[in-house]
UniProtKB/Swiss-Prot annotation:
Domain notes: Contains a domain homologous to an NEBU domain that is known to bind actin.
Assembly with partners or alone: Interacts with viral envelope protein E18 and the DNA-binding protein p6.9.
Annotated region described as NEBU-like domain, given as residue ranges: 103-134
Organism: Autographa californica nuclear polyhedrosis virus (AcMNPV)
Entry protein name: Protein Ac132
UniProt keyword annotations, A-Z: Host cytoplasm, Host nucleus, Late protein, Virion
Location relative to the cell: Host cytoplasm; Host nucleus; Virion
Lineage top rank: taxon: Viruses
Protein role: Plays an essential role in nucleocapsid entry in host nucleus. May act by binding and stabilizing F-actin in the infected cell, which might attach to nucleocapsids and then push the nucleocapsids into the nucleus.
Keyword Ribonucleoprotein attributed: no
Gene Ontology, cellular component aspect: host cell cytoplasm; host cell nucleus; virion component
Amino acid sequence: MSDKTPTKKGGSHAMTLRERGVTKPPKKSEKLQQYKKAIAAEQTLRTTADVSSLQNPGESAVFQELERLENAVVVLENEQKRLYPILDTPLDNFIVAFVNPTYPMAYFVNTDYKLKLECARIRSDLLYKNKNEVAINRPKISSFKLQLNNVILDTIETIEYDLQNKVLTITAPVQDQELRKSIIYFNILNSDSWEVPKYMKKLFDEMQLEPPVILPLGL
């Protein structure tokens, strides 16, 4: 027979906490702990007095800073939605522009009197969504638009992509004017029907871009 008197599990430890006048912080303090690093607070709980001070989270400077930041985020999100309503609308187009010399361009006129424009440094992972599309290697003509000088062409006849050399070649009707500027627009979302945004075209119309290099007559 044991001479130990049964005691309530954890009773001795609980009595010690009560003697110290310490109680567990309310559940709100758990949220406070989760966000403590995010708000760059250096306050730490070094003594039992510090723990006791969290009994009323509303009186904690860290908790008040957390509430302030959360309210500021809500205000910022509402302001962004007001200024940029596009953030709440479905995204139908995502347009990338290739311009010379960032993407080096060169051209020639072949014997069929067609303009061949070559654009280098274009990665396959930008043109294609997956490895299957890369293997097929057929750029979708409707995803591209070509601007020569300040005019966006109505017609692109063919598009080819050299995987090894990362060169995109566009065939289009030859132009009567001297070619001073060329921009290739690519809609990443591959929409069949889309237009180049006016603000984007205006931007490139006003920019002084380097003209594409003229190559010898090709076949």
